[in-house]
């Protein structure tokens, strides 16, 4: 038992101390071989153990590095959810309209110089600009006014002298315009307070600067009233209006209605405009 314990102890000490094979010997050669084999197996096991630790450490390091790289890749490829912080507070670029709509109304203040025909100046402006002009009001003084009064059985009369504009309104459309689309109505006050007015059909000479407030447009729908059932059905089915300004302006049409003057309006002395009877001057509308 003591020899067995000693041998076991010697082998245990040999394995622990890692000494050479010649320190402890026994009579059994098989045990020596076994001891040597055990010692070699122990060194091989220790070497494999250290190598395994190194492999594990290197794998851990590579795993950490790969994990870090994978994490950075995930951060790059992954799209964050929701709005970025402060995105609502970023200044937005202004909206710039480079082209106005065809249905836009533009306001104008037209100044007609002294000695010029107000009617002719506005008509020329509408024709050259290719825009419809709607006259809203006007101020200033005029002379040599040729108008048509409804109380004079449609006769054209010329007012001599200087008059102040009380009211000025009308419309001017560039050609081709439907009949009666261009018209200008004026009310004037004389030197003694008399008021006279009518539709301008002749000269309207400015005695001083005349300021005209107007609005212009480029698109207008021309329609005939009253609408019959067939046309109303076509317009409701295929849409109407718009497009060309004068595409439907065919055939004859009545002129725009005149302002009716009160019957008690005091008349001032006028003389007939002889050019109207001879067919000269501006054609009546």
Curated annotation (Swiss-Prot):
Residues 78-90 bind DNA. Preferentially expressed in roots, but also in flowers and leaves. Detected in the inflorescence meristem, floral primordia and developing reproductive organs. GO terms for biological process: anther development; carpel development; negative regulation of DNA-templated transcription. Residues 17-95 are annotated as: Disordered. Residues 39-50 have a biased composition (Basic residues). Residues 102-238 form the PPC domain. PROSITE patterns: PPC. One of its GO terms (cellular component) is nucleoplasm. Disruption phenotype: Reproductive defects. Residues 63-73 have a biased composition (Gly residues). GO terms for molecular function: DNA binding; minor groove of adenine-thymine-rich DNA binding. Transcription factor that specifically binds AT-rich DNA sequences related to the nuclear matrix attachment regions (MARs). Binds to the MARs present in the ETTIN (ETT) promoter leading to a negative regulation of its gene expression. Functions as a molecular node downstream of the homeotic protein AGAMOUS (AG), regulating patterning and differentiation of reproductive organs. Acts as a chromatin remodeling factor that modifies the architecture of ETTIN (ETT) chromatin by modulating H3 methylation leading to the regulation of ETT expression. This is AT-hook motif nuclear-localized protein 21. It comes from Arabidopsis thaliana (Mouse-ear cress). The lineage of its organism: Eukaryota, Viridiplantae, Streptophyta, Embryophyta, Tracheophyta. The gene is AHL21.
């Amino acid at each position: 038992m003591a020899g067995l314990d000693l041998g076991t102890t010697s082998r245990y000490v040999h394995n622990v101390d890692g000494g050479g094979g010649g320190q402890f010997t026994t009579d059994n050669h098989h045990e020596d071989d076994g001891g040597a084999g055990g010692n070699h197996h122990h060194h091989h096991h220790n070497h494999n153990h250290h190598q395994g630790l190194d492999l594990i450490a290197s794998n851990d390091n590579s795993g950490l590095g790969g994990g870090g790289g994978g994490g950075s890749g995930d951060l790059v490829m992954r799209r964050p959810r929701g709005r970025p912080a402060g995105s609502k507070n970023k200044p937005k670029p202004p909206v710039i309209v480079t082209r106005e709509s065809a249905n836009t109304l533009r306001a104008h203040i037209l100044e007609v110089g002294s000695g010029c025909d107000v009617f002719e100046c506005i008509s020329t402006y509408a024709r050259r600009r290719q825009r419809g002009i709607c006259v809203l009001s006007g101020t200033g003084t005029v002379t040599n006014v040729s108008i048509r009064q409804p109380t004079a059985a449609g006769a054209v009369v010329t007012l001599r002298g200087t008059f102040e504009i009380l009211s000025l309104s009308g419309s001017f459309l560039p050609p081709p315009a439907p009949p009666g689309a261009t018209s200008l109505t004026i009310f004037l006050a004389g030197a003694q307070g008399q008021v006279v007015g009518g539709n301008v059909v002749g000269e309207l000479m400015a005695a001083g600067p005349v300021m005209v407030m107007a609005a212009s447009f480029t698109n207008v729908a021309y329609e005939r009233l009253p609408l019959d059932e067939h046309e109303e059905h076509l317009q409701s089915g295929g849409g109407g209006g718009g497009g060309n300004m004068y595409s439907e302006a065919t055939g004859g049409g009545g002129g725009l209605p005149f302002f009716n003057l009160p019957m008690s309006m005091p008349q001032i002395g006028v003389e007939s405009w002889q050019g109207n009877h001879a067919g000269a001057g501006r054609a009546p509308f």
